[in-house]
Amino acid sequence: MVKCCSAIGCASRCLPNSKLKGLTFHVFPTDENIKRKWVLAMKRLDVNAAGIWEPKKGDVLCSRHFKKTDFDRSAPNIKLKPGVIPSIFDSPYHLQGKREKLHCRKNFTLKTVPATNYNHHLVGASSCIEEFQSQFIFEHSYSVMDSPKKLKHKLDHVIGELEDTKESLRNVLDREKRFQKSLRKTIRELKDECLISQETANRLDTFCWDCCQESIEQDYIS
């Protein structure tokens, strides 16, 4: 049985001369996480199940949906590098004409009847258009629903960075307070021992405050 590419609108078939044309076919990964990323990248919906399409054993994607850098060509048999994700797919708008033409052609072939009965042809055309419209609506809804998830992920990332910054600032302030307290204690002891005058003690105290403030600003910026 000839294998066909599972991507929407792709007519690539695994034929004996495919490799001569530079076309290779690759089964879906056994790693569930990577396979899930493949499926999401395809943006293919299962109209009958009203959900995301799931690959079956033996389903493949052709090399047209991968970048040149995704392949390992060091061995005689070209293979994909570990963990790569397909990224080259036609958009739904671009596929609209192709998909309608393919579905209609398939339905007309299956429903071919004598030329005297035109009603069957009209039914076939109507069903193929309805099938395409349903598929297009599901694909459009899927792409729209994906946006809030991405926004939520970005929001969580920003909130996490903000919390980390707050925690870092608190640590800096606590450290500088301890340092300032230690310096003032030393200045007070020097003054009590009459090793420095009151004027010098006041200057050192002011200098200590200015240095601490500057240090806090530098730590916060960095």
Curated annotation (Swiss-Prot):
Motif HCFC1-binding motif (HBM), residue range(s) on this chain: 139-142
Cysteines engaged in disulfide bonds, as pairs: none
Alphabetical keyword list: Coiled coil, DNA-binding, Metal-binding, Zinc, Zinc-finger
Database matches in InterPro entries: THAP_Znf (IPR006612), THAP_Znf_sf (IPR038441)
GO cellular component: microtubule cytoskeleton
Molecular-function GO terms, alphabetical: DNA binding; zinc ion binding
Zinc finger (THAP-type): 1-89
Superkingdom to which the source organism belongs: Eukaryota
Cited SUPFAM superfamilies: Glucocorticoid receptor-like (DNA-binding domain)
Annotated coiled-coil segments of the chain: 149-194
Record's protein name: THAP domain-containing protein 6
Organism lineage string: Eukaryota, Metazoa, Chordata, Craniata, Vertebrata
Gene this chain is encoded by: THAP6
